[in-house]
């Protein structure tokens, strides 16, 4: 099966802190906005807060192995994890009506950026948010 680029939305991490380890050998890209959104939930005293804190710990373990902005192997047999910095985003690629001031739209700009950087690979937005998936599919 061909390797894919996966843009993982905040909603996925907040429901499964260990999701990074479930995407086989596909490469995972995290727009910096996802990290900011996860951080907003870490003080909650429920399952969402617990998942936010565990996600941050998982990312910190990977950060200790190398540069997240360059890409770090998640585990042997799994893909790379790379953070997409705000300065990399192709904001001019966002269609009319999508704003760089809306978190979901910045995450979608991350997907457009990765798609442009790796045109020969399929780029997929993974989200539990139905509207996010609908908008992402409309950008193809």
How should these model regions be labeled?
Residues 4-124, 130-138:
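Active-site-proximal, substrate-binding regions of enzyme catalytic domains
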């Amino acid at each position: 099966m061909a390797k894919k680029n996966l843009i993982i939305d905040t909603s996925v991490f907040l429901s499964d802190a260990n999701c990074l380890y479930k995407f086989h050998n596909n490469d995972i890209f995290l727009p910096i906005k996802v990290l900011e959104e996860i951080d907003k939930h870490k003080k909650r005293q429920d399952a969402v807060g617990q998942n936010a804190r565990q996600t941050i710990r998982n990312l910190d373990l990977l950060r200790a192995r190398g540069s997240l902005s360059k890409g770090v192997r998640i585990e042997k047999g799994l893909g790379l994890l790379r953070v997409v910095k705000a300065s990399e985003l192709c904001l001019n690629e966002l269609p009319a009506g999508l704003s760089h001031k809306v978190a979901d739209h910045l995450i979608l700009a991350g997907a457009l950026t990765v798609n442009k950087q790796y045109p020969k690979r399929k780029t997929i937005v993974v989200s539990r948010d139905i509207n996010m998936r609908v908008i992402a599919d409309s950008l193809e």
